[in-house]
Amino acid sequence: MADLLRNQPIPSKERLNTMTRTVVESKTKTAIIGFDEPFCVIGERINPTGRKILAEELERGDFSRVEADAIAQAAAGANILDVNSGAVFSNKMAEDPRYADNNFVEPMLMPELIRVVQNAVDIPICIDSSVPGALEAGLEACEGRPLLNSVTGEEERLELVLPLVKKYNVPVVAISNDDTGISEDPDVRFEVAKKIVERAADFGIPAHDIVVDPLVMPIGAMATAGHQVFTLVRRLREELGVNTTCGASNISFGLPNRHGINNAFLPMAMGAGMTSAIMNPITLAVNPTKIAEKKAELVAAGIILPDEIDDETFVTLLGMGSTKPTPGKEMEAIRAANFLFDRDPHGTEWIKFNKVAPKAGQEGRGRAGRKGGRRR
């Protein structure tokens, strides 16, 4: 099968666009990752790795933050939600040594996470774990056709994950590292991706069900990181005919004003042919403590605040953000790029995203609160 793949003629651009559509489904909704499709946003927030409070809540059986994160990301425009089960249960570990092993914890936790997310929102899921048992437990619990995250070029991982991809007929994220680790050489990363596509073909898995992560390096540590990934994405598209994804925020790691870097990187990656990203689609709500501190600061400066001012009005007036999660600036950049690349016909999504809800009493009025009607 791999030899057949190697000998196939390169398809035309039009045929390539039609062929390379990765279909991910929930029970009721479909997300398509493709060269001629709007950019696919995979929300990353349901991940206890590095989120101590979330991990502690999950250990107590409290899934309220997972539900809230799912709803907020879907509302912000995420097309797929990544669900990661990599939690460390420190308290249970002290009582039962089995909890020190992720191979014990994650196969139990993953189905619970998926059930909570599926009950909260109706968009497709990306099952994310380094534990094959957790991946299969997630596949059993998931409705529709989820995206599996992930396989690598490591021999053991290939032999464990690709049979699951074939058995459940699902697409998979392929990360471009192998048994030698992560190479800084983009040519090596391309060869790893090619190896995964060829091995997948041996299992009867088509290239359109492989979504390659070419591994975005931090530009603060490697000045050529951006240029490398753009070149690599073009090669993956033209030579292997696969869709691509990345951890978008990796590019700005360790830098000030990370949103500024991310906002530039994402449209440029889209222009190079990247078709999806695993990213945070929301701007977090302003912390109540910060609101209280700012109010105290203003009062100390002799500024009198109206008694009737609510927190949302307060933070809006001061440019602090919102008391509710809102779509992040990266989502604005992606929607603009979709429009500019002709993946948003007539700018429908751009207009909907930027439409300001009328204030109370202003419904049905034109600009500046005028009543509708022809100017005389």
Give the ranges of each region predicted by the language model.
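Domain-level signal for soluble alpha/beta catalytic cores
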Residues: 1-211, 217-376
